[in-house]
Amino acid sequence: MIISFKYKFIFIKTYKTAGSSIESYLYQFLSANDVYAHTADNNGINCWGEFDPENKLSNFFDKDTYNERISKKLRFYAHMPAWLIKDRLDIYSKRLKFDIFDNFYKFAVIRNPFDLIVSDYFWRKNSNFMNEKSFDEIIQELKNNKYQTHGLLNLNKLMDIKQENILCDYIIKYENLNEGLLKVFNK
């Protein structure tokens, strides 16, 4: 998940859709004020998901309020749903009198559900996150709502909290990833 103040975009990372690769590419364009909620690398960019790495905006709050209540609520993480990103950004938006979420370009990638499940199956199998279940057993668990997806099917990550509206400006189909990213980068 990335929030770029320099380029005014929010990349909402979904599961098994090249999210880490997209983050790795975008990383080179980020500044110290941008949020990069991915803990694989820390080269001075805000990779721990802190909204305010240089404390430039914390002066809007008294020190106790910021340290005790606000900073804990402003952490971001890699596969954070859009509604929660919006909710956390709204805390600063009110103080800045500028709606960050609504004024930034928001994009995400989704994938054919079957391909996504196949990718997840092999990722879990190769990562030792699952026992010796066969793919057929996984499909049966999906049918019976017993497969632990952790939000794997992704579309709900792009919706508001009531699951009524999509909060992204643009959704890229994984099958058209290159064309979709070109469209985003030319925006």
Give short role names for the model-derived ranges.
Residues 1-187:
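Membrane-interface amphipathic segments in extracytoplasmic regions
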